[in-house]
Amino acid sequence: MIEQLKQAKNWEDRYRLIIQAGKNLPRPSDNELAQMQPITGCEAQMWFQIMPKNDRTFQFSGFSEARIMNGLLWILFNQINGKTADELNTFDITVFFSELGISQRLSEMRLNGLNQIGQQLKNLCI
């Protein structure tokens, strides 16, 4: 998916890929949503959860009411799931989505939601 996004010729192609990716993100049950942390400041409601694993890596889950955000979450989780705190400390969510040609086309509120997730990733290393 990453290479497809990088090679997309225009925003419309990227947008279709993002929406398609979001279909892979399962909708959590109400109980699962209740266990996730709400992300404030985004255009649509969004939830995020960090789950530490026994091997010192992390697994992430989340959901949004907006299809585009679900696609972005799915793309993000495929990039960061299974990483250690040290690996996550060097990951820059802003650079990641910028290199994919996505950040430039998102609203400030959507970027704010992603940046809050990025801050939570950095907080894992404190």
UniProtKB/Swiss-Prot annotation:
- Tell me which stretches of the chain form a coiled coil: none
User: InterPro entries per the record?
Assistant: Fe-S_metab-assoc_dom
An example of a Pfam family matching this protein is SufE
The highest taxon in the source lineage is Bacteria
What is the residue range of the signal peptide feature? Answer: none
Matching PANTHER family: SUFE-LIKE PROTEIN 2, CHLOROPLASTIC, SULFUR ACCEPTOR PROTEIN CSDE
Question: Which family, according to UniProt?
Answer: Belongs to the SufE family.
Name of the protein this chain belongs to: Uncharacterized SufE-like protein HI_1293
What species was this sequence derived from?
Answer: Haemophilus influenzae (strain ATCC 51907 / DSM 11121 / KW20 / Rd)
